[in-house]
Amino acid sequence: MKNCYQKAFQVFFLLSITSSLSFGQAKWKPITQQTKPWSRWWWEGNAVNPKDLTYNMETYQKAGLGGLEITPIYGVKGQEANFIDFLSPKWVEMFKYTLNEGTRLGLGIDLANASGWPFGGRWVTPEDACKNVNFKTYQLKEGEKLLELITFQQSPLLRYVLPKKTEISALKYPISKNDNLQELAIDQIKYEKPLPLQTLMAYSDKGEVMNLTDKVSAMGQLNWEAPKGNWTLYAIFQGWHGKMVERAGPGGEGDVIDHFSEKAIQHYLKEFDKAFANTDVSSMRAFFNDSYEVDDARGQSDWTDDLFKEFQQRRGYDLRNYLPNLFSKENTDLNHRVLFDYRTTIGDLILEKYTGEWAKWAHGRGKIVRNQAHGSPANTLDLYGLVDIPEIEGTDLLRIKFASSASNVLGKKLTSSESATWENEHFLSTLSDVKKALDLFMVGGVNHIFYHGTNYSPKNEAFPGWLFYAAVHFTPQNPFWKDFATLNHYVARTQAFLQDSKPNNDVLLYFPITDRLTEPSPKGLLEHFDGVTPEFNGTDFKASAQKMIDRGYGFDFISDKQIANLKTQNQQIITGGVAYKTVLLAESEQVPLETLEKLVQLAKAGATIIVHHKLPTDVPGLGNLDERRAKFKALLAQLNFVKVNAQLNQAKIGEGSFLLGEDLDELMIYAKIYRETMTDKGLQFVRKTSAKGNYYFVNNKSEQAFEGLVKLEAEANSAALYNPMTEVLGMAKVKNNEVFLQLSVGESCIIETFKTVEKGKSYPYWKASKEAEELKGTWKISFIDGGPTLPKAIETQTLGSWTNAGNAYQDFSGTALYQLNFVKPKTNAQGYWLDLGKVAESASVTLNGKYLATLLGPTYKVFVPNTLLKNQNKLAIKVTNSMANRVIALEKEGTVWQKFYNINVSARLKQNLGKDGYFTTKGWSPRASGLLEKVSLTPVEVLK
């Protein structure tokens, strides 16, 4: 079979090649606790004990994990006697034991700052709980008095996860007084109660505004007669949003805090100070905050006690004078400006009063913070910028880049990811699927992988153990755990490079949040920012970002606040200790005055600013509008554009210039910004700066194997090549700044470039010298690990799914050993590709007693040196399938494995939803398992 290749071989090639050896300039970096992948570690019901904690942690450590983030969540039914309340003395004792074991085993420990998410719990009072705004309007004419009492009765609301009828009238107030919150699994609750009046404002048809709040009695009676004109009265009442902590464990159930209130977060965190007051938790690394999901509920948490005060201090005018504009549905410029100012104030409060206070609290206790900012009604770039480790999740590369952009722009060392959150339906995700997800994160700038996730489960718990409702199930009960270490070693080797480097991107893409904050939303007053989609669908911002991804331009997003700290040096833009070549504005309509002032200042100092399509036209917001608008127009007037060519105009200013044009590629070329053309060939990458040159992490995302030269924009007079999966390394073929690569589907490599000509052992490239030869004979298949039982061994001369052998084989999940004796091929060669064909799902290969490789897919090939083959050969392949078939069997026999409080395992796909509202495998057929196609050897020779 021609062009049958995969870079490298496993563990050895003639000489033993391991991570401890290096060839010339090619050398693996040290593996540390931090370079290894970590995992979210769910403590269900906090029902942990020292013996099983040790068992679990030792198992994780042996599999190659570097650390764990403890997130206590809902419990397991039947384990109530073992439940431990979050932050109780017993819980702190178990946490301290875990820290000690982590130190012994070399496992780092982070802790979620809540039992579930968002921040909240039983100790959160109604005063500190998340709020919302409610309003009523009244109409009066001259001489009229309002007879109606100014009151607002909050309507009752009860949303819960469990399909169980619960009457709100049976629940005590406040919610923390109820003892059965674990069973109730309440998601949101609003009690029927009168709401306090915050303000009463009157607006005449002539533009007059009056504050009538002090004219309202305690009973709600307004003592006021309308003067001349027609008057509209707005009464503002502060209510309770009612959001409860999601997936909370025992002791952690309760109200979510007000994320806009400094006193709320301070009161909340005091509970942790109290719990840890007499305990040494110095070995703990970080506190963690999950994504902002306060508004995953009915309505929005859109208010706080002192919003009017904060608004006036920050925006320079009284919001109470513009309540009709804030709540209006009409699309007018004034309404949009007031809405912008309201949303900006909310964003400021989350940034300063919540995220900032949380980080300050943690730092004061010697801890760092990891934060998921996505989903917040604020500029996520700024929220990420306040924390030590920004964390992202998802499968959209543009979304991923928000967290890494903040790290890159502000000089942070680590960007983490909640990885493979729900890669496939339960029990179907493979290690190959996970690797694909991890590669995307690393291409997006992530260098600190966290799996989502791993359940604490007692050693003797029956299959499938304790599980989380939405996960790949990185747990020892999953058969793929046997091969999990292979993936973890791959991640560790890759992250060792990605952590020991600095970002190397050319473009700072301005995040035009102003345009979104100005636009009303049918969902409510707030606008949440989760990424680029769907918030920026149809915008040039999204189109330009995607084009830069597709065309191979390195870029980071940047916010207004971050632009304020940029500097120009040698015609480059400096931030976070790294240099960029330009700031790109992609058809932004409104830009803050301060941002335009800074961009002009940068250009005057020698920078190049690129504007795609058109310049911004106005400033946002209402405060001091005329003065700001005049200054804005004066700045634009300084930009005197001259046509350079049909595609491009330039305005020189000071030592630099603004470039304006329709064609993004033309603008980049004129600014001397050049793309990495490897993206044209189906390759994706991230480029980093190393001590001696650059690193490229390159992944073949296409459906075809790649072989050929790849032009690099970084200077490469020589280059080292590393395969982090196979551990093969050596000096690459380089010609005219082009590096020769061979990448199978889904395969990755690391290129290290040097500005000088470095010498060393060459990287081995292989090409097929003859056609593939099928390995024929009698295969013996023995079932060696798994369940529910170990089926009898079988023999076959034709490979196919072992589920075809009968019911016992259909029910089996685990590992089977395939053994074959074969004669050495007649064709002599320098080596051979052993191709397993299609495999379900992973395979560990041994030949003549020598371990070769563990193959995760999607390509199942391994290099065999000719010195290993004998006249008579013994091939042994351990194939591991998924959990699915055993779970299917459990359901068929009526065994109850879904025994969890709260959500109790939900379906990712609707077709897998049972009548009870839970996930089910009913209707599933057994999944194909084992070696599914012929196995072959292909003679290969060195490609010169």
Regions found by a protein language model. Give the residues of each.
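Bacterial Sec-dependent N-terminal signal peptides
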Residues: 1-26
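Mature N-terminal, pre-catalytic/accessory segment of carbohydrate-active enzymes
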Residues: 22-274, 278-284, 931, 938-944
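Carbohydrate-binding surfaces of carbohydrate-active enzymes
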Residues: 38, 43, 49, 54, ...
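An acidic-aromatic loop/edge-strand motif
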Residues: 117-120, 124, 139-142, 158-193, ...
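Short aromatic-centered micro-motifs
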Residues: 202, 573, 651, 843-849
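Exposed aromatic-hydrophobic patches
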Residues: 221-224, 738-741, 861-867
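C-terminal structured "cap/appendage" subdomains that terminate the fold
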Residues: 571, 586, 594-597, 611, ...
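Aromatic-lined ligand-binding clefts that engage carbohydrates, nucleic acids, or primary amines
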Residues: 822-848, 855-856, 875-879
